[in-house]
A protein has these predicted regions:
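Basic nucleic-acid-binding interfaces
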Residues: 1-88
């Protein structure tokens, strides 16, 4: 599963042809969660408060780019790297 963004130790990944709603897979220090792109809310799993806040802000700030990657993933096309909250 490609890493589409990495910031502050948070890995953001996306599967090709994954189930709806549009979401990202987030890993941080042994915690895993599915996070809705539209809202930044955790829809499955759990993250520490700080990581949850950072990923929510990232989803809301970068919303167009993860949605574009979601559409590429559904079409089984290569995904684009998205800048992290630390602007990497």
């Amino acid at each position: 599963m490609p890493v589409i963004s990495y910031f502050f130790g948070i890995y953001v990944r996306m599967y090709n042809d994954d189930h709806a709603p549009p979401h990202v897979h987030v890993e941080y220090q042994g915690h895993e969660a599915l996070v809705a792109i539209a809202s930044g809310d955790i829809i499955e799993g759990a993250l520490p408060r700080r990581a949850a806040r950072l990923i929510k802000e990232w989803c809301l700030d970068q919303q167009a780019a993860p949605i574009e990657d979601w559409q590429l993933a559904q079409a089984l096309l290569p995904l684009k790297r998205i800048p992290g909250a630390d602007n990497d």
